[in-house]
Protein backbone atom coordinates (compact mmCIF):
# COMPACT_ATOMS: atom_id res chain seq x y z
CA UNK A 1 0.00 0.00 0.00
CA UNK A 2 1.34 3.43 -0.94
CA UNK A 3 2.07 5.87 1.84
CA UNK A 4 -0.37 8.76 1.93
CA UNK A 5 1.01 12.03 0.61
CA UNK A 6 0.23 14.88 2.99
CA UNK A 7 -0.97 18.33 1.96
CA UNK A 8 0.18 21.46 3.75
CA UNK A 9 -1.91 24.45 2.69
CA UNK A 10 -0.07 27.77 2.63
CA UNK A 11 -2.42 30.64 3.48
CA UNK A 12 -0.01 33.56 2.94
CA UNK A 13 -2.00 34.98 0.04
CA UNK A 14 -5.17 35.32 2.04
CA UNK A 15 -3.14 37.85 4.00
CA UNK A 16 -1.77 39.35 0.77
CA UNK A 17 -5.31 40.30 -0.27
CA UNK A 18 -6.04 41.76 3.16
CA UNK A 19 -2.82 43.79 3.30
CA UNK A 20 -3.48 45.24 -0.17
CA UNK A 21 -6.19 47.42 1.39
CA UNK A 22 -5.17 47.37 5.02
CA UNK A 23 -8.50 45.87 6.05
CA UNK A 24 -9.37 43.22 8.63
CA UNK A 25 -10.56 40.82 5.94
CA UNK A 26 -10.11 38.25 4.52
CA UNK A 27 -9.04 36.56 7.73
CA UNK A 28 -6.15 34.05 7.55
CA UNK A 29 -7.42 32.47 10.76
CA UNK A 30 -10.73 31.59 9.11
CA UNK A 31 -8.85 30.35 6.06
CA UNK A 32 -6.75 28.04 8.21
CA UNK A 33 -9.84 26.54 9.83
CA UNK A 34 -11.61 26.10 6.49
CA UNK A 35 -8.55 24.44 4.95
CA UNK A 36 -8.35 22.03 7.86
CA UNK A 37 -12.03 21.20 7.57
CA UNK A 38 -11.53 20.42 3.87
CA UNK A 39 -8.75 17.95 4.63
CA UNK A 40 -5.48 19.88 4.88
CA UNK A 41 -2.97 17.94 6.95
CA UNK A 42 -1.31 21.12 8.16
CA UNK A 43 -1.19 24.87 7.68
CA UNK A 44 1.91 26.57 6.33
CA UNK A 45 2.58 30.27 6.73
CA UNK A 46 5.60 32.45 6.14
CA UNK A 47 6.01 35.52 8.31
CA UNK A 48 8.49 37.52 6.28
CA UNK A 49 10.65 40.17 7.92
CA UNK A 50 8.97 42.90 5.83
CA UNK A 51 5.52 41.70 7.00
CA UNK A 52 4.16 41.94 3.47
CA UNK A 53 1.39 39.44 4.18
CA UNK A 54 1.30 37.31 7.35
CA UNK A 55 1.47 39.35 10.57
CA UNK A 56 2.59 38.27 14.03
CA UNK A 57 -1.01 38.43 15.24
CA UNK A 58 -2.06 35.95 12.53
CA UNK A 59 0.53 33.43 13.65
CA UNK A 60 -0.41 33.75 17.32
CA UNK A 61 -4.12 33.29 16.66
CA UNK A 62 -3.69 30.44 14.18
CA UNK A 63 -1.46 28.58 16.60
CA UNK A 64 -4.27 28.73 19.17
CA UNK A 65 -7.03 27.39 16.90
CA UNK A 66 -5.31 24.77 14.72
CA UNK A 67 -6.48 21.19 15.08
CA UNK A 68 -3.68 19.83 12.88
CA UNK A 69 -0.23 21.42 12.96
CA UNK A 70 1.54 24.62 12.04
CA UNK A 71 4.49 24.75 9.66
CA UNK A 72 6.08 28.15 10.21
CA UNK A 73 8.44 29.29 7.47
CA UNK A 74 11.05 31.77 8.64
CA UNK A 75 14.31 33.39 7.67
CA UNK A 76 17.50 32.53 9.51
CA UNK A 77 17.61 35.69 11.63
CA UNK A 78 17.67 36.35 15.36
CA UNK A 79 14.37 38.24 15.20
CA UNK A 80 12.57 35.37 13.49
CA UNK A 81 14.08 32.77 15.79
CA UNK A 82 13.02 34.84 18.80
CA UNK A 83 9.49 34.91 17.41
CA UNK A 84 9.52 31.14 16.84
CA UNK A 85 10.56 30.72 20.46
CA UNK A 86 7.38 32.56 21.46
CA UNK A 87 5.11 30.58 19.11
CA UNK A 88 6.68 27.11 19.44
CA UNK A 89 5.44 25.79 16.08
CA UNK A 90 5.21 22.04 15.61
CA UNK A 91 7.24 22.42 12.42
CA UNK A 92 9.66 25.17 11.43
CA UNK A 93 11.06 25.50 7.92
CA UNK A 94 14.11 27.69 7.40
CA UNK A 95 13.97 29.55 4.08
CA UNK A 96 16.09 32.16 2.28
CA UNK A 97 14.60 35.63 2.11
CA UNK A 98 15.24 38.79 0.08
CA UNK A 99 13.16 41.91 0.53
CA UNK A 100 13.15 42.68 -3.21
CA UNK A 101 11.79 39.27 -4.32
CA UNK A 102 8.13 38.69 -5.17
CA UNK A 103 8.33 35.17 -3.79
CA UNK A 104 11.06 32.85 -2.56
CA UNK A 105 13.44 32.56 -5.52
CA UNK A 106 15.51 29.53 -4.57
CA UNK A 107 16.63 27.21 -1.85
CA UNK A 108 18.62 27.93 1.27
CA UNK A 109 22.37 27.78 0.62
CA UNK A 110 23.49 25.64 3.54
CA UNK A 111 26.99 25.20 2.13
CA UNK A 112 27.66 28.94 2.29
CA UNK A 113 25.88 29.63 5.57
CA UNK A 114 26.51 26.36 7.37
CA UNK A 115 27.39 27.73 10.82
CA UNK A 116 24.42 30.09 10.96
CA UNK A 117 22.01 27.41 9.73
CA UNK A 118 23.37 24.82 12.14
CA UNK A 119 22.88 27.15 15.11
CA UNK A 120 19.33 27.91 13.98
CA UNK A 121 18.51 24.22 13.60
CA UNK A 122 19.76 23.47 17.10
CA UNK A 123 17.87 26.37 18.61
CA UNK A 124 14.60 25.35 16.97
CA UNK A 125 15.06 21.75 18.03
CA UNK A 126 15.57 22.85 21.63
CA UNK A 127 12.16 24.55 21.36
CA UNK A 128 10.63 21.22 20.39
CA UNK A 129 10.05 22.07 16.73
CA UNK A 130 10.70 19.60 13.94
CA UNK A 131 13.07 21.48 11.64
CA UNK A 132 12.96 21.48 7.86
CA UNK A 133 15.32 23.18 5.41
CA UNK A 134 13.98 24.53 2.11
CA UNK A 135 16.67 23.66 -0.43
CA UNK A 136 17.24 23.16 -4.14
CA UNK A 137 17.26 19.56 -5.41
CA UNK A 138 21.03 19.35 -5.14
CA UNK A 139 22.96 16.47 -3.58
CA UNK A 140 25.57 18.69 -1.95
CA UNK A 141 22.88 20.76 -0.25
CA UNK A 142 21.16 17.56 0.86
CA UNK A 143 24.38 16.26 2.40
CA UNK A 144 24.82 19.61 4.12
CA UNK A 145 21.29 19.36 5.55
CA UNK A 146 22.27 16.07 7.17
CA UNK A 147 25.50 17.59 8.46
CA UNK A 148 23.70 20.45 10.25
CA UNK A 149 21.27 18.03 11.89
CA UNK A 150 18.01 18.73 10.07
CA UNK A 151 15.71 15.68 9.95
CA UNK A 152 13.50 17.09 7.18
CA UNK A 153 14.08 18.89 3.89
CA UNK A 154 11.67 20.57 1.52
CA UNK A 155 12.75 20.42 -2.10
CA UNK A 156 12.25 23.62 -4.07
CA UNK A 157 10.06 22.80 -7.07
CA UNK A 158 10.11 26.29 -8.57
CA UNK A 159 12.35 25.49 -11.55
CA UNK A 160 10.06 22.59 -12.46
CA UNK A 161 6.96 24.76 -12.10
CA UNK A 162 8.44 27.63 -14.12
CA UNK A 163 9.82 25.49 -16.97
CA UNK A 164 8.80 26.88 -20.35
CA UNK A 165 9.26 23.69 -22.37
CA UNK A 166 8.46 20.01 -21.94
CA UNK A 167 12.16 19.16 -22.15
CA UNK A 168 13.07 21.60 -19.40
CA UNK A 169 10.19 20.45 -17.21
CA UNK A 170 11.18 16.80 -17.67
CA UNK A 171 14.77 17.65 -16.77
CA UNK A 172 13.71 19.44 -13.60
CA UNK A 173 11.33 16.62 -12.67
CA UNK A 174 14.20 14.14 -12.93
CA UNK A 175 16.35 16.36 -10.71
CA UNK A 176 13.63 16.36 -8.06
CA UNK A 177 13.13 12.59 -8.32
CA UNK A 178 16.84 11.89 -7.97
CA UNK A 179 17.17 14.34 -5.09
CA UNK A 180 14.21 12.77 -3.29
CA UNK A 181 15.65 9.28 -3.71
CA UNK A 182 19.06 10.42 -2.49
CA UNK A 183 17.63 12.23 0.53
CA UNK A 184 15.47 9.26 1.48
CA UNK A 185 18.55 7.03 1.30
CA UNK A 186 20.07 9.29 3.98
CA UNK A 187 16.97 8.80 6.15
CA UNK A 188 15.68 12.32 5.64
CA UNK A 189 11.97 13.07 5.54
CA UNK A 190 11.42 14.68 2.14
CA UNK A 191 8.78 17.31 1.42
CA UNK A 192 8.42 19.52 -1.65
CA UNK A 193 6.81 22.74 -2.73
CA UNK A 194 6.82 26.05 -4.58
CA UNK A 195 4.91 26.88 -7.73
CA UNK A 196 2.86 23.68 -7.75
CA UNK A 197 -0.65 23.97 -9.17
CA UNK A 198 -3.52 21.86 -10.46
CA UNK A 199 -1.91 21.17 -13.85
CA UNK A 200 1.60 20.23 -12.72
CA UNK A 201 1.18 18.61 -9.32
CA UNK A 202 0.60 15.00 -10.38
CA UNK A 203 4.12 14.13 -11.60
CA UNK A 204 5.53 15.51 -8.34
CA UNK A 205 2.91 13.77 -6.22
CA UNK A 206 3.83 10.47 -7.89
CA UNK A 207 7.36 10.59 -6.46
CA UNK A 208 7.13 7.83 -3.87
CA UNK A 209 9.78 9.27 -1.52
CA UNK A 210 7.86 12.48 -0.91
CA UNK A 211 6.05 12.85 2.40
CA UNK A 212 4.25 16.18 1.98
CA UNK A 213 3.57 18.91 -0.56
CA UNK A 214 3.18 22.52 0.54
CA UNK A 215 0.93 24.44 -1.83
CA UNK A 216 -0.57 27.89 -1.44
CA UNK A 217 -0.89 30.35 -4.32
CA UNK A 218 -2.66 27.95 -6.68
CA UNK A 219 -5.16 26.88 -4.02
CA UNK A 220 -5.97 30.46 -3.01
CA UNK A 221 -6.33 31.44 -6.68
CA UNK A 222 -8.70 28.53 -7.36
CA UNK A 223 -10.66 29.43 -4.22
CA UNK A 224 -11.71 32.73 -5.82
CA UNK A 225 -13.90 30.75 -8.19
CA UNK A 226 -15.01 27.70 -6.22
CA UNK A 227 -14.37 28.46 -2.56
CA UNK A 228 -11.43 27.49 -0.38
CA UNK A 229 -12.79 24.18 0.85
CA UNK A 230 -13.47 22.92 -2.66
CA UNK A 231 -10.06 24.14 -3.83
CA UNK A 232 -8.35 22.17 -1.06
CA UNK A 233 -10.42 19.05 -1.75
CA UNK A 234 -9.61 19.19 -5.46
CA UNK A 235 -5.88 19.43 -4.80
CA UNK A 236 -6.03 16.51 -2.38
CA UNK A 237 -7.90 14.48 -4.98
CA UNK A 238 -5.23 15.10 -7.63
CA UNK A 239 -2.49 14.11 -5.19
CA UNK A 240 -4.32 10.94 -4.21
CA UNK A 241 -4.92 10.00 -7.85
CA UNK A 242 -1.20 10.40 -8.57
CA UNK A 243 -0.32 8.07 -5.71
CA UNK A 244 -2.58 5.31 -7.05
CA UNK A 245 -0.10 4.66 -9.87
CA UNK A 246 3.01 4.53 -7.71
CA UNK A 247 4.45 1.05 -7.32
CA UNK A 248 5.27 -0.20 -3.84
UniProtKB/Swiss-Prot annotation:
EC class name: transferase
Pathway per the UniProt entry: Cofactor biosynthesis; pyridoxine 5'-phosphate biosynthesis; pyridoxine 5'-phosphate from D-erythrose 4-phosphate: step 5/5
A GO cellular component entry from the record: cytosol
Subcellular location(s) per record: Cytoplasm
Binding, 3-amino-2-oxopropyl phosphate: 10, 21, 195, 216-217
Catalytic reaction equation(s): 3-amino-2-oxopropyl phosphate + 1-deoxy-D-xylulose 5-phosphate = pyridoxine 5'-phosphate + phosphate + 2 H2O + H(+)
InterPro entries linked to this entry: Aldolase_TIM (IPR013785), PyrdxlP_synth_PdxJ (IPR004569), Pyridoxine-5'_phos_synth (IPR036130)
Binding residues annotated for 1-deoxy-D-xylulose 5-phosphate, in chain numbering: 12-13, 48, 53, 103
GO BP annotations, alphabetical order: pyridoxine biosynthetic process
CDD domains in the cross-refs: PNPsynthase
Presence of keyword Protease: no
Active site: 46, 73, 194
Gene3D superfamilies, per the entry: Aldolase class I
Assembly information from the UniProt record: Homooctamer; tetramer of dimers.
Function of the molecule: Catalyzes the complicated ring closure reaction between the two acyclic compounds 1-deoxy-D-xylulose-5-phosphate (DXP) and 3-amino-2-oxopropyl phosphate (1-amino-acetone-3-phosphate or AAP) to form pyridoxine 5'-phosphate (PNP) and inorganic phosphate.
Family, similarity comment: Belongs to the PNP synthase family.
Protein name in UniProt: Pyridoxine 5'-phosphate synthase
Gene source species: Legionella pneumophila (strain Paris)
Amino acid sequence: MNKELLLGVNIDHIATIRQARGTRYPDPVQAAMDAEEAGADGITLHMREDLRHIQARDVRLIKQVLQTRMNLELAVTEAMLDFAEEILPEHACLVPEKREELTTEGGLDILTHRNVVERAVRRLQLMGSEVSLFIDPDKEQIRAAVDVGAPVIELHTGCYADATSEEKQHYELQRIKEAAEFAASLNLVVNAGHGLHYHNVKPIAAIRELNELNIGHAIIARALFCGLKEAVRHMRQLMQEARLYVND
